[in-house]
Amino acid sequence: MTTFTLADLDRIVRSRAAASPEESYTAKLIAAGPGKPAKKLGEEAVEAAIAAVQGDRTSLVSEAADVLYHLLVVLAGGGIPLEEVMAELERRTTQSGLAEKAARRRP
């Protein structure tokens, strides 16, 4: 079991985002504007879904890592702290998924 966390990855992503785009893939993605990292996130999510459907565990682990990385790049580029997303997840765990979805449909 690893001690590496999503918060650890987030710190690395945000550090690399502050680097020069010539030196950092992360910075290059963010410098390209929100469309580029969002497109990469979508591509990786589709690849993860395909690996899941195919039952390819090794590929799914790899693609899931790509999804998490690219999601953190999108968040960093949008100025959204990981803590804000984690707080939303925590809030959602206080009620059932069905109750949470029903609450979102109310005007």
From Swiss-Prot:
One of its GO terms (molecular function) is phosphoribosyl-ATP diphosphatase activity. It catalyses: 1-(5-phospho-beta-D-ribosyl)-ATP + H2O = 1-(5-phospho-beta-D-ribosyl)-5'-AMP + diphosphate + H(+). Keywords: Amino-acid biosynthesis, ATP-binding, Cytoplasm, Histidine biosynthesis, Hydrolase, Nucleotide-binding. Its EC number is 3.6.1.31. Pfam families: PRA-PH. It comes from the Bacteria. It is found in: Cytoplasm. It is an enzyme of class 3 (hydrolase). SUPFAM superfamilies: all-alpha NTP pyrophosphatases (SSF101386). Transmembrane segments: none annotated. Pathway: Amino-acid biosynthesis; L-histidine biosynthesis; L-histidine from 5-phospho-alpha-D-ribose 1-diphosphate: step 2/9. InterPro entries: HisE, PRib-ATP_PPHydrolase-like. CDD domains: NTP-PPase_HisIE_like. GO terms for biological process: L-histidine biosynthetic process. One of its GO terms (cellular component) is cytoplasm. Belongs to the PRA-PH family. This is Phosphoribosyl-ATP pyrophosphatase. It comes from Methylobacterium nodulans (strain LMG 21967 / CNCM I-2342 / ORS 2060).
